């Protein structure tokens, strides 16, 4: 096993919308990398069951994307709730890094953090208070080096595990092309 307090935890959530007061988590996935962005382990990815009333209340964008990806059907058929997904995710992460050591890594992670705080508070507490948000580098590249930003094409599937893989690859790209750092 590759336990180290330098490991990075990457997380992505799919939700029924953007408002944690009204919307809920419908998918969670995690990946653990070392500090060089080498993938050490892919955590369990869970479609999280939510009541039909909540799913039918989704806006058109979420309904369309989560139907096209197959996530909506997986959510309806899932028996996993938020507490079970949180517990199993924590059990996986504890094998790779101590609590409070890894920043929350991914794209637009402040949004994920809002939902974790409300619906998965134990998992939220497991992360360091800092974030490693790849979106920051994307925004900087768009403003300071638009040719570098334009050369990186990212096609989100809006499936949590693939979105994490894409975020890791995006950070590798910016490390090499924007920051001019090799592995």
Swiss-Prot record:
Role description: 3'-to-5' exoribonuclease specific for small oligoribonucleotides.
Organism, as annotated: Coxiella burnetii (strain RSA 493 / Nine Mile phase I)
Enzyme Commission number: 3.1.15.-
Subcellular location: Cytoplasm
Domain Exonuclease as annotated: residue spans: 8-171
PANTHER family named among the record's database cross-references: OLIGORIBONUCLEASE, MITOCHONDRIAL
Active site: 129
Record-given protein name: Oligoribonuclease
Gene name as annotated: orn
Biological process according to GO: DNA metabolic process
Cellular component GO terms, alphabetical: cytoplasm
């Amino acid at each position: 096993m590759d336990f180290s307090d330098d490991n990075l935890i990457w997380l992505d959530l799919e939700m029924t919308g953007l408002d944690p007061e009204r919307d809920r988590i419908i998918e969670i996935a995690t990946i653990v990398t070392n500090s060089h962005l080498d993938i050490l382990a892919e955590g369990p990815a869970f479609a999280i069951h939510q009541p039909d009333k909540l799913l039918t209340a989704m806006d058109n964008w979420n309904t369309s994307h989560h139907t096209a990806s197959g996530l909506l059907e997986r959510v309806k058929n899932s028996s996993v709730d938020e507490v079970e997904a949180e517990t199993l995710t924590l059990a996986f992460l504890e094998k790779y890094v101590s609590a409070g050591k890894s920043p929350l890594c991914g794209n637009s992670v402040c949004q994920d953090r809002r939902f974790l705080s409300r619906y998965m508070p134990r998992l939220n507490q497991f992360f360091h208070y800092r974030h490693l948000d790849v979106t920051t580098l994307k925004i900087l590249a768009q403003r300071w080096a638009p040719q570098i930003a334009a050369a990186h094409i990212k096609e989100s599937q809006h499936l949590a595990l693939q979105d994490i893989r894409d975020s890791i690859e995006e950070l590798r790209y910016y490390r090499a092309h924007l920051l001019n750092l090799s592995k």
